[in-house]
Regions:
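Short Lys/Arg-rich basic patches
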Residues: 2-7, 13
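Hydrophobic alpha-helical bundle segments that form small-molecule/ligand-binding pockets
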Residues: 90, 119-121, 132-162, 176, ...
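Short, basic, alpha-helical segments at the C-terminal edge of helix-turn-helix-like DNA-binding modules
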Residues: 65-71
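Amphipathic alpha-helical interface segments
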Residues: 20, 24, 94, 168-175, ...
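Amphipathic alpha-helical packing segments from all-alpha helical-bundle domains
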Residues: 72-80, 101-104, 121-148, 160-163, ...
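Helix-turn-helix
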Residues: 12-16, 20-58, 62
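Amphipathic alpha-helical segments used for helix-helix packing
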Residues: 100-125, 174
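Hydrophobic alpha-helical connector segments
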Residues: 62, 73-105, 151-165, 188, ...
């Protein structure tokens, strides 16, 4: 009687699977990434892949969480300009290079939001959940950088700035994916200047109203 093969769950094996899936995803996309190819690239047997991740949807859901943890560590900075530079020049601009896997993956993840055919897909649901967490993370980073009097007058002002910043970043992800001839560093600075001007103008308006 053949012995049942036991697959050992280890952090090393799980990381190898996620690294392999990430490498495939940024070049082959969701549809083109298969569990068997993940097994081949990771050097692990097919059974080990399914032992860790029941199916491709669950694998991609975990991959999104994995990339989100990297994103949180990378998106830091003392000013709004630093944050936008990281989001636009670093993340969106960097996503054009498949070798920059953690950034390139977010182009694929954005497709989950755009493709309605995947409405019930677990990976899509995970991306939309993580997208909300990303938003709240940025709100927590941005609000302390806005003058207190502006937030007192409009408590949603910080969230509005994050909505604007995210819209800009999403647009630049598409530009990178399309291969547009864009100087991402230049446009990151232009975007930061625009956001800073909006904040400064609102603070100035409030100051004038107070002194009138």
């Amino acid at each position: 009687m053949a012995r049942r093969r036991v697959h050992q769950s280890t952090p090393e094996n799980e990381r190898a699977i996620l690294d392999a899936a990430l490498s495939l995803a940024v070049t082959a996309g969701y549809e083109g990434t298969t569990m068997s190819e993940v097994a081949r690239l990771s050097g692990l047997p097919n059974g080990s892949i399914y032992y860790h991740f029941e199916n491709k949807e669950k694998l991609f859901a975990e991959l999104i969480e994995f990339c989100f943890e990297i994103w949180k560590k990378d998106h830091t900075g003392p000013t709004n300009r630093d944050l936008l530079r990281r989001s636009i020049a670093g993340s969106a601009g960097g996503s054009a290079d498949p070798e920059n896997k953690a950034e390139a993956f977010w182009v694929l993840a954005l497709m989950f939001a755009l493709d309605r055919r995947l409405e019930d897909n677990l990976a899509r649901k995970k991306y939309l959940e993580v997208r909300k967490e990303m938003f709240e993370h940025m709100v927590r980073r941005v609000e302390p950088l806005i003058p207190a009097e502006v937030l007192a007058e409009d408590p949603e002002f910080g969230r509005k700035m994050v909505v604007l910043g995210r819209a800009l970043t999403d647009g630049f992800y598409i530009a990178a994916c399309a291969g547009d001839d864009v100087d991402f560093a230049e446009f990151a600075d232009l975007s930061a200047t625009a956001v800073e001007a909006l904040i400064a103008r609102r603070a100035e308006q409030l100051s004038k109203e107070k002194n009138s």
